[in-house]
């Protein structure tokens, strides 16, 4: 895991370094940040069975609570995550750092779902989409993530989630116990 993760992290940092050098004193454009962050991981998913196995392991580590998975991910991606979050904060001054972290987390989760190629996309799209097409995934994921970062922050007085609404929902074929 770490060997491939370090390749992704190093490529992300190299892309960010180049983008920062090109932008000079200004901040790196949001689209550039998102594309540069996502591309190395989606490229890895195309590197044969080893790349696909890495993505599955990464998805598993991300989905499991526990110190080992967190420590491995922090060791592999900690420096690149800090750099990208900092750059995203500069590119999204309308968001708090907390909001950027949340949206960054959603972006990471999205690319892991897409790159795991578990067959679900093909299933619910009726074969119209192929999760193995990483270029199509990137072309769809970049504007999706950008829209998330550009969205207004949530209202401070937003209504909380009502757990009873879901618990009381009528589900066909389900009997209350």
What are these regions (language model features)?
Residues 7, 11-51, 104:
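Hydrophobic alpha-helical connector segments
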Residues 28, 32-35, 66-92:
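Amphipathic alpha-helical packing segments from all-alpha helical-bundle domains
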Residues 29, 33, 37, 50-57, ...:
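Residue-level detector of well-ordered alpha-helical segments, enriched
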Residues 32, 49-75, 119-123:
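Amphipathic alpha-helical segments used for helix-helix packing
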Residues 37, 41, 55-62, 107, ...:
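Short alpha-helical scaffolding segments that buttress acidic/His motifs in well-ordered protein cores
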């Amino acid at each position: 895991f770490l060997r491939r993760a370090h390749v992704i992290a190093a490529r992300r940092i190299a892309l960010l370094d180049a983008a920062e050098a090109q932008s000079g004193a200004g901040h790196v454009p949001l689209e550039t940040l998102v594309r540069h962050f996502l591309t190395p991981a989606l490229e890895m998913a195309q590197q044969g069975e080893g790349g696909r196995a890495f993505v599955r392991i990464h998805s598993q580590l991300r989905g499991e609570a526990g110190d080992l998975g967190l420590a491995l991910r922090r060791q592999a991606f900690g420096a690149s995550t800090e750099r990208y979050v900092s750059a995203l904060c500069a590119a999204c001054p309308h968001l708090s750092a907390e909001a950027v972290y949340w949206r960054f987390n959603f972006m990471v989760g999205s690319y892991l779902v897409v790159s795991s190629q578990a067959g679900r996309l093909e299933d619910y799209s009726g074969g119209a989409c192929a999760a193995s097409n990483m270029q199509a995934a990137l072309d769809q994921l970049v504007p999706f993530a950008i829209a998330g970062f550009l969205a207004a922050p949530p209202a401070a007085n937003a209504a909380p989630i009502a757990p009873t609404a879901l618990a009381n929902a009528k589900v066909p074929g389900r009997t209350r116990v």
